[in-house]
Protein backbone atom coordinates (compact mmCIF):
# COMPACT_ATOMS: atom_id res chain seq x y z
CA UNK A 1 0.00 0.00 0.00
CA UNK A 2 1.43 3.43 -1.00
CA UNK A 3 1.76 6.28 1.46
CA UNK A 4 -0.95 8.24 -0.35
CA UNK A 5 -3.33 5.25 -0.23
CA UNK A 6 -2.66 4.81 3.46
CA UNK A 7 -3.24 8.50 4.12
CA UNK A 8 -6.50 8.42 2.21
CA UNK A 9 -7.71 5.41 4.20
CA UNK A 10 -6.71 6.99 7.48
CA UNK A 11 -8.44 10.20 6.45
CA UNK A 12 -11.61 8.30 5.59
CA UNK A 13 -11.57 6.40 8.86
CA UNK A 14 -11.07 9.55 10.90
CA UNK A 15 -13.73 11.62 9.14
CA UNK A 16 -16.35 8.85 9.16
CA UNK A 17 -15.62 8.11 12.81
CA UNK A 18 -15.92 11.81 13.58
CA UNK A 19 -19.20 12.02 11.70
CA UNK A 20 -20.57 9.00 13.52
CA UNK A 21 -19.63 10.45 16.88
CA UNK A 22 -21.00 13.87 16.05
CA UNK A 23 -24.25 12.49 14.64
CA UNK A 24 -24.66 10.25 17.65
CA UNK A 25 -24.38 13.21 20.02
CA UNK A 26 -25.98 15.91 17.87
CA UNK A 27 -28.63 17.95 19.59
CA UNK A 28 -32.17 16.77 19.09
CA UNK A 29 -34.57 19.33 20.49
CA UNK A 30 -36.85 17.55 22.95
CA UNK A 31 -40.41 18.55 23.73
CA UNK A 32 -40.12 21.43 26.19
CA UNK A 33 -43.02 20.35 28.39
CA UNK A 34 -42.04 18.28 31.42
CA UNK A 35 -44.86 15.86 30.66
CA UNK A 36 -44.99 13.47 27.70
CA UNK A 37 -47.03 14.63 24.74
CA UNK A 38 -50.34 12.83 24.52
CA UNK A 39 -51.65 11.11 21.43
CA UNK A 40 -53.72 13.52 19.39
CA UNK A 41 -57.45 12.91 19.88
CA UNK A 42 -58.34 13.31 16.22
CA UNK A 43 -59.44 10.33 14.16
CA UNK A 44 -58.00 9.40 10.78
CA UNK A 45 -60.75 11.42 9.13
CA UNK A 46 -59.79 14.65 10.92
CA UNK A 47 -56.04 14.47 10.43
CA UNK A 48 -54.34 16.54 7.70
CA UNK A 49 -53.39 15.14 4.31
CA UNK A 50 -49.78 14.72 3.27
CA UNK A 51 -46.65 13.24 4.80
CA UNK A 52 -43.94 14.44 7.13
CA UNK A 53 -41.31 13.51 9.67
CA UNK A 54 -42.32 12.30 13.14
CA UNK A 55 -40.28 11.67 16.27
CA UNK A 56 -40.70 9.27 19.17
CA UNK A 57 -38.14 10.26 21.81
CA UNK A 58 -37.37 7.86 24.63
CA UNK A 59 -35.79 9.69 27.58
CA UNK A 60 -33.55 7.23 29.43
CA UNK A 61 -32.72 7.69 33.10
CA UNK A 62 -29.10 8.78 33.57
CA UNK A 63 -28.24 9.48 37.21
CA UNK A 64 -25.41 11.83 38.09
CA UNK A 65 -21.97 10.21 38.38
CA UNK A 66 -23.10 7.16 36.42
CA UNK A 67 -22.06 5.84 33.03
CA UNK A 68 -24.25 6.10 29.96
CA UNK A 69 -26.32 2.94 29.59
CA UNK A 70 -26.07 2.59 25.83
CA UNK A 71 -27.67 -0.85 25.99
CA UNK A 72 -30.99 0.77 26.90
CA UNK A 73 -31.32 2.24 23.41
CA UNK A 74 -30.50 -1.18 22.02
CA UNK A 75 -33.20 -2.70 24.25
CA UNK A 76 -35.74 -0.19 22.95
CA UNK A 77 -34.67 -0.99 19.41
CA UNK A 78 -35.10 -4.73 19.85
CA UNK A 79 -38.21 -4.79 22.04
CA UNK A 80 -40.14 -1.73 20.83
CA UNK A 81 -38.99 -0.44 17.45
CA UNK A 82 -38.48 -3.83 15.76
CA UNK A 83 -42.02 -5.11 16.45
CA UNK A 84 -43.57 -1.73 15.63
CA UNK A 85 -41.68 -1.62 12.34
CA UNK A 86 -42.66 -5.19 11.47
CA UNK A 87 -46.33 -4.35 12.07
CA UNK A 88 -46.48 -0.91 10.46
CA UNK A 89 -43.71 -0.88 7.84
CA UNK A 90 -46.29 -0.08 5.15
CA UNK A 91 -46.96 3.22 6.93
CA UNK A 92 -43.28 4.20 6.85
CA UNK A 93 -41.61 5.66 3.77
CA UNK A 94 -38.20 6.23 5.34
CA UNK A 95 -36.87 6.06 8.89
CA UNK A 96 -33.86 5.99 11.17
CA UNK A 97 -32.79 5.70 14.79
CA UNK A 98 -30.75 8.31 16.62
CA UNK A 99 -28.90 8.46 19.92
CA UNK A 100 -27.67 11.36 21.99
CA UNK A 101 -26.30 11.73 25.49
CA UNK A 102 -25.24 15.01 27.06
CA UNK A 103 -25.77 16.32 30.56
CA UNK A 104 -27.64 19.39 29.33
CA UNK A 105 -30.06 17.44 27.13
CA UNK A 106 -30.08 14.01 28.74
CA UNK A 107 -29.86 10.51 27.28
CA UNK A 108 -32.35 10.14 24.44
CA UNK A 109 -32.99 7.35 21.96
CA UNK A 110 -35.15 8.47 19.02
CA UNK A 111 -37.17 6.68 16.37
CA UNK A 112 -37.62 9.11 13.47
CA UNK A 113 -39.88 8.23 10.55
CA UNK A 114 -41.55 9.78 7.51
CA UNK A 115 -45.25 8.94 7.28
CA UNK A 116 -48.78 10.27 7.06
CA UNK A 117 -50.41 11.64 10.23
CA UNK A 118 -52.65 8.57 10.19
CA UNK A 119 -49.63 6.28 10.06
CA UNK A 120 -47.91 8.26 12.81
CA UNK A 121 -50.97 7.92 15.02
CA UNK A 122 -51.01 4.15 14.56
CA UNK A 123 -47.31 3.91 15.36
CA UNK A 124 -47.57 6.18 18.40
CA UNK A 125 -50.49 4.13 19.73
CA UNK A 126 -48.47 0.92 19.33
CA UNK A 127 -45.54 2.48 21.20
CA UNK A 128 -47.82 3.76 23.95
CA UNK A 129 -49.38 0.30 24.38
CA UNK A 130 -46.08 -1.61 24.24
CA UNK A 131 -45.63 -3.64 27.42
CA UNK A 132 -41.88 -3.03 27.61
CA UNK A 133 -42.39 0.73 27.35
CA UNK A 134 -44.93 0.60 30.17
CA UNK A 135 -42.57 -1.49 32.31
CA UNK A 136 -39.60 0.82 31.72
CA UNK A 137 -41.70 3.86 32.59
CA UNK A 138 -43.05 2.21 35.74
CA UNK A 139 -39.55 1.23 36.87
CA UNK A 140 -38.12 4.68 36.16
CA UNK A 141 -35.63 3.41 33.58
CA UNK A 142 -37.50 5.60 31.11
CA UNK A 143 -38.40 9.02 32.48
CA UNK A 144 -40.82 9.82 29.66
CA UNK A 145 -41.61 9.23 25.99
CA UNK A 146 -42.24 12.30 23.83
CA UNK A 147 -44.26 12.17 20.62
CA UNK A 148 -45.35 14.77 18.07
CA UNK A 149 -48.78 16.30 17.58
CA UNK A 150 -50.25 14.35 14.66
CA UNK A 151 -52.76 17.10 13.87
CA UNK A 152 -49.95 19.24 12.39
CA UNK A 153 -47.34 18.37 9.76
CA UNK A 154 -44.35 20.56 10.66
CA UNK A 155 -41.59 18.76 8.70
CA UNK A 156 -43.08 17.88 5.29
CA UNK A 157 -39.89 17.82 3.20
CA UNK A 158 -37.56 14.85 2.98
CA UNK A 159 -34.61 17.10 3.88
CA UNK A 160 -36.28 18.71 6.90
CA UNK A 161 -34.44 16.58 9.46
CA UNK A 162 -31.05 16.73 7.72
CA UNK A 163 -28.30 19.12 8.80
CA UNK A 164 -29.05 22.51 7.24
CA UNK A 165 -25.31 23.14 6.82
CA UNK A 166 -25.01 20.36 4.25
CA UNK A 167 -25.32 20.91 0.51
CA UNK A 168 -28.88 20.48 -0.77
CA UNK A 169 -28.16 17.20 -2.63
CA UNK A 170 -26.71 15.75 0.57
CA UNK A 171 -29.66 16.94 2.66
CA UNK A 172 -32.13 15.29 0.28
CA UNK A 173 -30.32 11.96 -0.08
CA UNK A 174 -28.74 11.43 3.35
CA UNK A 175 -31.99 10.03 4.86
CA UNK A 176 -31.72 7.02 2.53
CA UNK A 177 -28.16 6.30 3.64
CA UNK A 178 -28.87 6.52 7.35
CA UNK A 179 -32.01 4.40 6.93
CA UNK A 180 -29.86 1.61 5.49
CA UNK A 181 -27.43 1.89 8.38
CA UNK A 182 -30.31 1.92 10.88
CA UNK A 183 -31.93 -1.13 9.27
CA UNK A 184 -28.62 -3.01 9.38
CA UNK A 185 -28.21 -2.08 13.05
CA UNK A 186 -31.77 -3.13 13.94
CA UNK A 187 -31.41 -6.46 12.15
CA UNK A 188 -28.10 -7.07 13.95
CA UNK A 189 -29.85 -6.33 17.26
CA UNK A 190 -32.52 -8.91 16.41
CA UNK A 191 -29.92 -11.49 15.35
CA UNK A 192 -27.88 -11.10 18.53
CA UNK A 193 -30.98 -10.95 20.76
CA UNK A 194 -32.17 -14.27 19.31
CA UNK A 195 -28.96 -15.87 20.56
CA UNK A 196 -29.85 -14.78 24.10
CA UNK A 197 -33.32 -16.37 24.02
CA UNK A 198 -32.71 -18.19 27.33
CA UNK A 199 -32.23 -14.91 29.19
CA UNK A 200 -35.47 -13.50 30.61
CA UNK A 201 -33.78 -10.47 32.22
CA UNK A 202 -34.01 -7.83 29.47
CA UNK A 203 -31.39 -5.57 31.02
CA UNK A 204 -28.87 -8.41 31.21
CA UNK A 205 -29.84 -9.64 27.75
CA UNK A 206 -29.32 -6.31 26.02
CA UNK A 207 -26.07 -5.60 27.82
CA UNK A 208 -24.81 -8.73 26.09
CA UNK A 209 -26.36 -7.65 22.79
CA UNK A 210 -24.71 -4.22 23.04
CA UNK A 211 -21.36 -5.86 23.82
CA UNK A 212 -21.82 -8.03 20.74
CA UNK A 213 -22.62 -5.01 18.58
CA UNK A 214 -19.53 -3.21 19.85
CA UNK A 215 -17.35 -6.23 19.08
CA UNK A 216 -18.74 -6.51 15.54
CA UNK A 217 -18.38 -2.78 14.90
CA UNK A 218 -14.80 -2.63 16.13
CA UNK A 219 -13.72 -5.83 14.39
CA UNK A 220 -15.59 -5.67 11.07
CA UNK A 221 -16.94 -2.14 10.69
CA UNK A 222 -13.87 -0.86 8.86
CA UNK A 223 -14.23 -3.27 5.95
CA UNK A 224 -17.94 -4.09 5.97
CA UNK A 225 -19.00 -0.45 6.22
CA UNK A 226 -16.27 2.16 5.85
CA UNK A 227 -14.31 0.44 3.08
CA UNK A 228 -17.40 -0.20 0.97
CA UNK A 229 -18.74 3.30 1.53
CA UNK A 230 -15.39 4.61 0.31
CA UNK A 231 -15.64 2.33 -2.73
CA UNK A 232 -19.05 3.78 -3.66
CA UNK A 233 -17.42 7.21 -3.88
CA UNK A 234 -14.53 5.96 -6.03
CA UNK A 235 -11.95 5.89 -3.22
CA UNK A 236 -11.59 9.66 -3.30
CA UNK A 237 -9.96 11.56 -0.39
CA UNK A 238 -12.19 13.56 1.92
CA UNK A 239 -12.03 17.13 3.13
CA UNK A 240 -11.86 16.95 6.91
CA UNK A 241 -13.31 19.54 9.29
CA UNK A 242 -13.70 19.38 13.06
Task: Please provide the spans of the model-predicted regions.
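Bulky hydrophobic/aromatic packing residues
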Residues: 1-3, 19, 109
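Bacterial N-terminal signal peptides that target proteins for export
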Residues: 2-13
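Bacterial N-terminal signal peptides
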Residues: 13-23
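An acidic, charge-biased composition feature
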Residues: 21-242
Amino acid sequence: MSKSDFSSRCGLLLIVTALLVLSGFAAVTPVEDDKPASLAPGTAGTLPDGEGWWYARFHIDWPEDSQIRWHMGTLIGGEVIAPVFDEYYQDIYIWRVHRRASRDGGHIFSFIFYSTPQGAQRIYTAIQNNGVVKSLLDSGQLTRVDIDDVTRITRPNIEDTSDARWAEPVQKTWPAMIMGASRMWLDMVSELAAEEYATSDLDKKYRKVQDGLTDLWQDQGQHAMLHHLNAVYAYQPLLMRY
